Amino acid sequence: MPMYGDLGNKLVQHAKRTQNLSHLPPYQTELVRAVAREIRDLDKDVASLLEPFQGSFDPSAEQATACTLLVNHLSMRRNKRCLLAYHRIRTDKLEELVWNGADILDLAGQTTGGPKGVTEGNEGGGTTSSLSPQEEDYFRQFGDLLALYKGQWTDIDLTGSLEPPRDLFIDVRVLKDAGEIQTEYGAINLTKNSQFYVRQGDVERLIVQGYLQKLG
């Protein structure tokens, strides 16, 4: 039999797994709604228990009722903390992806479908965006804010790696088509599965974005 807080605990487990992933898994819409619905139901139960006392409730005289109220209150509080933790982890991941130069179209295009793609809170076939509408809006606005901040220092890449490259030139494999890019030594057409020996500074951003894989 499900207990209070079980759904919130599932959200925390999703958040914990998200911390160890390089991408953002699908937003658990139905699970979030279920936790919020449980909070509302508990709040209604609390109001119903207190209604007969008309503001004169004495916990010492009504210990059984006081115990029930305490359990309901702690359950609501825990559920709220689970919701906050889940959304905080996803927000941190979104901001990290913005700093790494991820594209909103790539994130929104991550889909789940079929038996292996079904996740709790997103049952059913078909395709589902990895981001909620609110997350897509936050991603865009944070990206705009970062672009405005970076615009003050046009000669410095504030999103670049803090570690200097060990090798000036590296071998890379193209993981997905990226089109033509201009480098210091000319244009390169990046087509899937092709390999190049290039200056690391020219392709570092594409490596971070997942278009290229560094070899060796």
Swiss-Prot record:
**A single GO BP:** DNA strand elongation involved in mitotic DNA replication
Quaternary structure (record): Component of the GINS complex which is a heterotetramer of div-26/sld5, drc-1/psf1, drc-2/psf2 and drc-3/psf3.
Subcellular localization, per the record?
A: Nucleus
Main localization of the protein described in the UniProt heading: nucleus
For bias type Gly residues, the affected ranges are: 111-127
**CDD domains this protein is in?**
GINS_A_psf1 (cd11710), GINS_B_Psf1 (cd21696)
The annotated region (Disordered) lies at: 110-133
Keywords attached to this entry: DNA replication, Nucleus
A GO CC term assigned to this protein in UniProt: nuclear replication fork
Under Pfam families, the record lists: PSF1_C (PF24997), Sld5 (PF05916)
Protein's name according to its UniProt entry: DNA replication complex GINS protein psf1
UniProt lists the family membership as follows: Belongs to the GINS1/PSF1 family.
State the organism named in the record.
Answer: Neurospora crassa (strain ATCC 24698 / 74-OR23-1A / CBS 708.71 / DSM 1257 / FGSC 987)
Q: Gene symbol?
A: drc-1
| Function summary | The GINS complex plays an essential role in the initiation of DNA replication.
